[in-house]
């Protein structure tokens, strides 16, 4: 029998979130009552904290907030539900249900996230349970899509190595399943499972314990030469090592993470550091033991310092390696060589193994809906009706129609043509390499616009791009509405992080291959200043770049910023 987990003594008073988790009866709280309370479209904050473990955030429409306050109404509460899709894989049947959920219960759109998951926004409280039950019918769920647990496990999307990719994808699915919370609360609350009145004495979380992790935890697997998952931004980054076209194991990197707090230099983005190599049969055990180290030693007092990166930085990588070896009972091997070439996606039709085809669509900022002159949601619905392969959500918020048989390719190509679905070929390379988080109006943390603003800002930057002949030059550009890092803006060659309405910090100098952070270049500037700052740098780059030199490398060589390979130097 598995014994209950007892945490070692903690320093500092536990945060209020730790109290909520401890008292929650394994994530139940009072959710059953408050989600059925007809007097409010929202729920109390304690239950909102627990809803995250069930894959949902309570939000409100911030565009309406002031007017509703004036009318003495409660905020326009709504729920965002994030669906867990390991490796970004979804069947056509699952796609059709997500499409229906967006139109039936949401705001009519799907958001593809930078962690290869679906998000549906605008769900009213009374519809959340129906939503959960209907996605369950096609074997989808939102358990652990948010919260202080391991989140959606990411996996490289690489059609050029289809057989290998499938093997690696299967490992991402196994990791996701192995690290799921074991509480029955999700099934009780949303799927009408048998109720457990008080499970404190008989329910066990064999990996997490009753308090779960100090903060969220993220894992991704990359297959070189593609680093589309931004493997060094993860708590655990796994790099598939291939010899003679066969997977022999994974290099393991630990302690990455993007979030920080403006003005607090004790918080910073950080790159995961490689600690060695493991064979595939050791993967689940190694990941579990790493998570238990964070469970036991992570900061449960100050949440902004609770991520795994701070645990490692506070105690040292040598301490971590010794502790991991102690828990495993064996030492991992030396890291193996590999090379990354890019973090972006390859668009259009690509022929993979076994004669099957893959088509990658450019989805600007991951937003799928029927625009006035671009029926993207409808077009993809029609493809899902005839497609016999699968869909792959990419870490760059794009979409791959994957494993298309030669027999279906003509039909799907015709639908792509009919609805003018785009691979982005007519867009600038800058736009094709852009990412933005949702931000306003639904994100409660947003300080500035992101998804609604970045496309128009890029249009203005493209004027400079056109003038300098850089239209086909790939430059990674990302925008976050706050410093929490959902768009991984700290790993962009040009990064924007919101400071306030219409104001951003401008960061430069991350690497095109995803192994270096950027650094602040200008603080708290608006659009006019952004364009004025970028113009001379882009002109300089166009004139004096070396052959094959990426923008992020150039701005370091030219002295605009210094290189950052350790997050503790991010603010220096």
UniProtKB/Swiss-Prot annotation:
Function as written in the Swiss-Prot or TrEMBL entry: Component of the sulfite reductase complex that catalyzes the 6-electron reduction of sulfite to sulfide. This is one of several activities required for the biosynthesis of L-cysteine from sulfate.
Oligomeric and partner information: Alpha(8)-beta(8). The alpha component is a flavoprotein, the beta component is a hemoprotein.
Upper taxonomic lineage: Bacteria, Bacillati, Bacillota, Bacilli, Bacillales
Gene Ontology CC entries for this record: sulfite reductase complex (NADPH)
Superkingdom of the source species: Bacteria
Keywords: 4Fe-4S, Amino-acid biosynthesis, Cysteine biosynthesis, Heme, Iron, Iron-sulfur, Metal-binding, NADP, Oxidoreductase
EC number from the UniProt entry: 1.8.1.2
InterPro entries on file: CysI, NiRdtase/SiRdtase_haem-b_fer, Nit/Sulf_reduc_fer-like_dom_sf, NO2/SO3_Rdtase_4Fe4S_dom, NO2/SO3_Rdtase_4Fe4S_prot, NO2/SO3_Rdtase_4Fe4S_sf, NO2/SO3_Rdtase_FeS/sirohaem_BS
Catalytic reactions of this protein: hydrogen sulfide + 3 NADP(+) + 3 H2O = sulfite + 3 NADPH + 4 H(+)
Gene: cysI
Protein name: Sulfite reductase [NADPH] hemoprotein beta-component
């Amino acid at each position: 029998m598995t014994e209950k987990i007892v945490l070692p003594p903690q320093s500092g008073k536990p945060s209020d979130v730790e109290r909520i988790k401890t008292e929650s009866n394994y994530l139940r709280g009072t959710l059953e009552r408050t989600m059925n309370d007809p007097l409010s479209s929202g729920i109390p904050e304690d239950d909102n904290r627990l809803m995250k473990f069930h894959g949902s955030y309570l939000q409100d429409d911030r565009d309406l907030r002031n007017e509703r306050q004036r009318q003495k109404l409660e905020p326009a509460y709504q729920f965002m539900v994030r669906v867990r899709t390991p490796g970004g894989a979804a069947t056509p049947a699952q796609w059709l249900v997500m499409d229906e959920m967006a139109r039936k219960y949401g705001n009519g759109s799907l958001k593809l996230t930078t962690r290869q998951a679906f998000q549906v926004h605008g769900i009213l409280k009374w519809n959340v349970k129906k939503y959960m039950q209907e996605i369950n019918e096609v074997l989808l769920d939102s358990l652990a899509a948010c919260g202080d647990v391991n989140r959606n496990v990411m996996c490289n999307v690489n059609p050029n190595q289809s057989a290998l990719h499938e093997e690696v994808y299967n490992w991402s699915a196994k990791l996701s399943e192995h690290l799921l919370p074991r509480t029955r609360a999700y099934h009780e609350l949303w799927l009408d499972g048998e109720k457990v009145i008080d499970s404190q004495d008989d329910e066990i979380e064999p990996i997490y314990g009753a308090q779960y992790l100090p903060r969220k935890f993220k894992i991704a697997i990359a297959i070189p030469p593609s680093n589309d998952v931004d493997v060094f931004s993860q708590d655990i980054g796994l790099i598939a090592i291939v010899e003679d076209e066969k997977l022999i194991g994974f290099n393991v990197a630990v302690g990455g993470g993007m979030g920080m707090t403006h003005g607090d230099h004790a918080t910073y983005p950080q790159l995961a550091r490689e600690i060695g190599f493991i064979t595939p049969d050791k993967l689940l055990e190694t990941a579990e033991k790493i998570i238990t180290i964070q469970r036991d030693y992570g900061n449960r007092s100050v949440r902004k310092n609770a991520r795994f990166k701070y645990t490692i930085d506070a105690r040292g990588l040598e301490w971590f390696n010794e502790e991991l070896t102690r828990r495993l009972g064996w030492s991992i091997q030396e890291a193996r060589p590999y090379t990354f070439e890019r973090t972006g996606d390859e668009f259009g039709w690509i022929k993979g193994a076994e004669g099957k085809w893959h088509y990658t669509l450019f989805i600007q900022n991951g937003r799928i809906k029927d625009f006035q002159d671009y029926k993207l949601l409808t077009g993809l619905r029609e493809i899902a009706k005839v497609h016999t392969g699968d869909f792959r959500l990419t870490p760059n918020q794009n979409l791959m129609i994957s494993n298309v048989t030669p027999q279906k390719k003509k039909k799907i190509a015709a639908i792509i043509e009919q609805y003018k679905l785009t691979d982005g070929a007519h867009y600038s390379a800058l736009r094709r390499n852009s990412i933005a988080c949702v931000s306003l109006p639904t994100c409660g943390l947003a300080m500035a616009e992101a998804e609604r603003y970045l496309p128009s800002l890029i249009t203005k930057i493209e004027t400079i791009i056109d003038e300098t002949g850089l239209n086909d030059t790939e430059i990674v550009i990302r925008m976050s509405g706050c410093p929490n890092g959902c768009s991984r803006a700290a790993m962009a060659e040009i990064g924007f992080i919101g400071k306030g309405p219409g104001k951003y910090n401008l960061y430069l100098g991350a690497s095109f291959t995803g192994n270096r952070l950027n650094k602040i270049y200008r603080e708290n500037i608006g659009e006019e200043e952004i364009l004025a700052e970028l113009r001379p740098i882009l002109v300089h780059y166009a004139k004096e770049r070396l052959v094959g030199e990426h923008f992020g490398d150039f701005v370091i060589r030219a002295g605009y910023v210094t290189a950052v390979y350790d997050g503790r130097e991010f603010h220096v």
